[in-house]
């Protein structure tokens, strides 16, 4: 069967449902596709189709994720939903499913629960820019004061983790009512109201091509008579021939000029996000550039050695460690294209980290890496992946 053509006429946004187990994330995902299918913006995907999500591998970690797509009048959405709590943790930390925003689902009957808190914290740590709340199962709560109480609790919890709890839209409804065509106010209409909130409150992400230029260095060649060529895939932005760039990471930052861009052996006047290019650098010797550095727009990225991270440590079954590790653990941290040794400092009160845990930790690298918040990395021992992480904040 041929795939339907992906119409690129609307801005695209990646979102996902997060929240405690059994609060209705998957039912809500199904309900959104059902309600939007009426206007031709989606294909109805039933609960059991979403729930048996296929397994995917991201950075050597197996994650089950369901993907649905739909559109509103304003945007095209790719929506991810995970069957299990561990899948959420892995998904958010590896960035396997990039989230420009999230729909936090909270059962009105139960209020915020441990995973509600953990998913909000994870969203904060991994840099999900905005959340919208769907207060689900409102048809099970008769007392309006109780609903208000739950809403207040959710807002307080969001504020505690530095989300704007007072401003975040909270939509009250019932995913089940929408799926079973009952109580349109809590069902059908609430879903439309939720999508309106998602449309307006979750900011449109900046496209990679509009961001400042950055390209991780994969390989370096010397071409006699022409100079040094650096190859890699442009991560974001545009590099034009004649522009000044910086080489950042592993050693002192150097400024140089890009005197040529090649792709498939053809000369171009620019390379852009997604392109695999060779960049010719003026006056740069081959030994001055190495894999693991980045080429970038001057001043846009700085080299750092100390940062706070959120990490997931693989289980033995996932091919990870068989034993716990302690503070001063020294694995390699794989950033973009290279491994750098670093020392792990565990937070106060955390004695050790077991395989299968996710943990906030501080890392001190032995050499600097071009780094910014939200940058993903793998934790490796002798080339074997034992964990995945994301830079939560930079210390120095």
From Swiss-Prot:
Presence of the UniProt keyword Membrane in the record = no
The annotated region (G1) lies at 19-26
UniProt keyword Magnesium, yes or no: yes
Binding-site residues for Mg(2+), renumbered to this chain: 26
Q: Where in the cell is it found?
A: Cytoplasm
Task: Provide the residue positions that the database annotates as binding GTP.
Answer: 19-26, 81-85, 136-139
Main location per the UniProt record: cytoplasm
Q: Which InterPro entries match?
A: EF-Tu_GTP-bd, EF-Tu_GTPase, EFTu-like_2, EFTU_2, G_TR_CS, P-loop_NTPase, Small_GTP-bd, T_Tr_GTP-bd_dom
Origin superkingdom: Bacteria
Task: Provide the transmembrane region boundaries.
Answer: none
Q: Which reaction equation describes what this protein catalyses? A: GTP + H2O = GDP + phosphate + H(+)
Chain spans, region G2:
60-64
Q: Which GO terms describe its molecular function?
A: GTP binding; GTPase activity; guanosine tetraphosphate binding; translation elongation factor activity
Region called G5, residue ranges: 174-176
A Pfam family assignment: GTP_EFTU_D3
EC number(s) stated in the UniProt entry for this protein: 3.6.5.3
Q: Where is this region: G4?
A: 136-139
Q: Which keywords annotate this record?
A: Cytoplasm, Elongation factor, GTP-binding, Hydrolase, Magnesium, Metal-binding, Nucleotide-binding, Protein biosynthesis
Which parts of the sequence are annotated with region: G3? 81-84
Which cysteine residues pair off into disulfide bonds? Answer: none
A cellular component term from Gene Ontology for this protein is: cytosol
Q: Which family does it belong to?
A: Belongs to the TRAFAC class translation factor GTPase superfamily. Classic translation factor GTPase family. EF-Tu/EF-1A subfamily.
Q: Which NCBIfam families match?
A: EF-Tu (TIGR00485), PRK00049.1 (NF000766), PRK12735.1 (NF009372), PRK12736.1 (NF009373), small_GTP (TIGR00231)
Subunit structure and binding partners = Monomer.
Protein name according to UniProt: Elongation factor Tu
Tell me the lineage of the source organism.
Answer: Bacteria, Pseudomonadati, Pseudomonadota, Alphaproteobacteria, Hyphomicrobiales
